[in-house]
Every structure is written in C-alpha cells, then in structure tokens.
Amino acid sequence: MHSLRLIVVAIVASGLAVSGQAAEKAPDFNRDIRPILSRNCFACHGPDEHDRRGGLRLDDRDAAITEVDSGARAIVPGRPDESELVARINETDPDTTMPPPESNHVLTAAQKQLLAKWIAAGAPYSPHWAYVPPHAHAPPATKQVDWGNNWIDEFVLGRLEAEGLAPAPDADPVTLVRRVTFDLTGLPPTPAEVEAYLADTRPDAYMSLIDRLLASPRHAERMAAWWLDLVRYADTVGYHGDQPHNISPYRDWVIKAFLDNVPFDRFTVLQLAGDLVGPAAGEHPDEPALASAYNRLLQTTHEGGLQLKEYRAIYQADRIRNVSGVWMGATVGCAQCHDHKYDPYTSRDFYALGAFFADIDDEKHMDKAGFSRQNLNATPTVREPEIKVVGPFDRDRAAELDARIHSLENELPPLVLPPWAQPEQPEPETVVAKRLELERLEADRNAIDRKLMVTRALAEPRQVRLLPRGNWMDETGMVVQPTIPTFLGDLSAPGRPTRADLAAWLVRPVAQGGVGEFTARVTANRIWAICFGTGLCRSVGDLGGQGELPDHPELLDRLSLELIRSGWNVRDLVRTIVTSRAYRMSSDAPADLLARDPDNRLLARQGRWRLPAENVRDT
C-alpha cells in the first residue's frame, strides 16, 4: 500500500496530461467527475441509503469527506495521497480494488488521473445541472459578424470559433425546402411546391415558406404525432386480447391544440387535470374533458379474474413514469422498488407522485366480479366513467345531420302499399332510396357521436401506500399523501393537493415554488431534437445522473427561457430554430471534420438522421 501511495503522489505532482479539454482546464464536477462516479460508484455509494455499502456516500460532498465505517475517509480535499478513494481505484488486489471486478466496471487511466486531480483541487462539488434553473446567458462575442440570422447562431458560432472551426455552407435550396417540409409537416414537398420555392426570388421567400408550413394542418398533425408518441398513445388496451378502445377524440384534440397553438403550460394543465379545472375563456366546454383523456393512456387489462390491487399498482406506476419522463425528463420509475441509485428521488417520492392520481376512477375499467363482460371490459368505450363527447369542431355537423335524419324519418311512410291502393304514396324504389340515404346519414352521425375514455375524479381518493420493494401484496408500507419530490421543495397547496396542483407546479416559475424552467428545458430540448435529429442534451428522456451533459448548455438555457418568455409558445420556438442559419447549414462534412466531431456535437453542420417511421409511411 505504501508504494501505491507513492504512485498516487507522483501522478498528482507530475500533472500528467489528460486527453481532451479536461487536460487544459481544472476538472469540472458535472462535466468530468459526476459521470465517472455515477456510472461506476453510485449504485453502491449513492442516494439509495438502503443498499449503500460501507456507509460511504459519494453523491454528497459532506458525506463523501466524512469518516466511514472502516475509519477511513474516501475523500480528503486537497490530499489525494490520503484519500481512500484514490487508493482503492489504483489497487490491484481484486478483494479491495474499486470498482469491484464483479461489477464489470473498469476505470481508465485518464479517469483515475481526473479523480486524483479533482481531489487535489479541493474536491469541489456542484449541483446537478438539470436541477439548477436556466440562466439568461448572453451570446458570446464572435469574430465573424455577418453569419447568423438570430441569437441561436451567435451561440453556435461562438462555440465553433472557440474550437477553431467554421460553420458549414448553407444547404442548397432543394435540400432546404425538403428538410424543412419534412421536419414541420412529416411529409415531403410536392414537385410543384419545390418549383414554387425555387421560383420565389423575394428576400423573405424562406420566411414565407416557414409561415405557410407552420399554419398548415399538416404541421399540427406532425407535432401531434411527436406528442402522442411521448404519452404512449394507442388505440388498443395493450394487454392480453389487445382489444380496441376509443381514445381517438383525444388524438383529435391534440391535433387541434397544436393547430390553435395552445400555450404549452395550458396544454399541460388540461391534460393532467382538465376534469378539475374546467374551460378557460375562449375554450370550448368539451376541451378539458377531451384533454383529460391523457390520464387514460396506459396499458389496461381485460383479463378475467384479475387482481384489482395488482393492476391498480401497475396503472399508478405507469402514470408516474410517463408524467415524470415527459415533463420532468426524469427516470422516477427507478424509485418504484427502492430509492433511486443515481438521482435524489426516493421511493416515498415515487408513491407520493402516484397519490396525485389516486382520485381517478379506474374501478369500472376492471371487472371486480372476476370475468370479462363485453359491455364492461372488452368494450371500454361504452362504460362509465365515460361521457358521450361530440367534438367542438363536429357539433354543427352533428346538428345538421340530426335535422336531415329527422326530416327523412318523417317522409317515410310506416307501411308500403301498392301504388294503385294509395296513389299519393311514393313508389317502393323511392322508399328504398330514402332508407339507404337514412342509413348513410345515421352512419355519419354515429361516427361523430363517440364515447371517449375521460377522467372522472372520485369524491374520496384512494389511499396510497409505499409498496416495499414494489410488492403490491405488501401493505406494511407507510401511507403517503400527494406531494412533489422532497428535494424539489414543498407544494404548499391548501388541503389535499390535486392533479391540478401538480400540473400548476410543473409550469410555475421556480421563484414561485414551481419547476417551470426545468419543464421548459426538457421541452425545448425535445423540440430542438425535432429539427436537428438529437437534443442539445442527447439523452432527451433522461436529464438525470445517468443522462448526458448538454453539448451547448448556455444555448439550451436560453431556449428554455425563450419558451417561457413567449408565453410557452411552441410554434414561436420552432420558428426561431428553423429560421436560424445553423438549421439551414449543409449536412455534408469534410473528412477532417468527421474525424474530429463524428457525432456533430459542436454543430459545425446540420445533422443526419433517419426519418421517423410515420414520415416514411405517410410519404
């Protein structure tokens, strides 16, 4: 061990070079150190206190520098030669080396040097970037002043100049019109549309193209397809017989919401709690009910003899995973059976989030009698808690059809007699024709008059317990009330918090006790991915400890704040992105650029990616 200490001292004293940027800068905790600890150490020495080994916790600085069960100190700030962590990662004895061989994790020499260098610098910790509110960064100064179209380009060009790179040339007009039409509508431009764009010599021809595409119903459908994938929309129940259920009115509402450019904060509240908040000024009375069908978008079982408590636990967990993933960019589902091993979510946090959804009436979605009934489980669109919904855009058409059907019914005689008996009666052929027309009209009317699985709140929400190890049969866990994750603050809602309180918290500013800026960051990152093929943080569904650092953190922060500043206007954010010169760059890259930046993290060119399956199919 003495010789090992000498090796460690030598490593630190010599200041051996570390590859990449880390060699030129002091180690940054979030950029350089946290990824090493998270991937290799936190599973046993992280937030999960129940599975923590040796009393050592490395995700918290105070705990990491404290003496542990063995009497050693894993980290002695400024003294890597006295830090047990440095000794263990350089140990060759399989019984004492860290990470242990059975973990199949092996640190590289560069990673070991980084850890030693970081401890020598005082072992400074930083909060995880995703839980620090975005800052209003000013774009960096650039040498080239005539390149960009908006502030996005200033951030991109500033980074490229710092890296000694230049942006790619603009894409040719045909490539550009195809790119933006695919990205904004999910469809290719027609030959006539391409020709029209090429023939348009106005300076604002591209802006006119963007405005036309953004106002198109096809753009609303494209954005709806993106959203419906996130919220796991499906026309069937998912389990066992995979029977159909009529959830399509929710899909139509999502399309209309994007067509009407509903602000994303309202879009959020209506889906999570439309049944609780009701319509706002200017909204159709049916819209909250249509939007609240989001809460019914989950796999459901129609199996005979199901265990009610089991599936109630399954449904609850599904809702928690989706809400936390879509709006928070978090893997809270990892805390279903134990405290999260990489992020500060506890099992109590998991079930407390689930308690928000304990008021949803799922009882009649499951047959408690122990067998499947056609009018109950196999056909979930004809059972309570459901309501008959006529979409706001179909109401006039429904009234028109009702009037026509009533008129035809009055025209038809109750009995057809020979023409010579009652000459004033219509001919049989006329009656048949009217009957056929009546059947057609009734079919059209029935297509409008649909039933939709919506959310109905129970007068008394169900009791929710923490399930030890996620076991639905274990009822020894503590009863939890609906609340937000502890490390994110206190909801401070009067009375029992509801889904409406949760939705409001997700879009309320941090200064007012919410996490609106965090939600905006997750959403802006996803929207960027639509236009560039990948997010500025590439792990778009996981901004936590196992996710990636953003390649352009200042740009991502600015996008987040711009989304809020615009009134949560998604269409404006899309317009800002696709009108940037960065978006309009060619995706071609010379060999030297591909060798240096094969994944296009620096944005010296446009990205290349496969079209979504929906686009290929529709094309």
Write out the residue ranges for each language-model feature.
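Positively charged n-region of N-terminal signal peptides that target proteins for export
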Residues: 1-6
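Bacterial N-terminal signal peptides
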Residues: 7-17
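Solvent-exposed helix-loop boundary motif
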Residues: 20-158, 174-179, 189-197, 236, ...
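Short metal-coordination and nucleic-acid-contact micro-motifs, chiefly zinc-binding Cys/His arrays
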Residues: 37, 327-333
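Short cysteine clusters
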Residues: 41-44, 334-338
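Primarily short, surface-exposed interaction patches in extracytoplasmic proteins
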Residues: 143-179, 183-218, 232-281, 343-344, ...
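Beta-propeller blade termini and top-face loops
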Residues: 223, 228-246, 250, 276-319
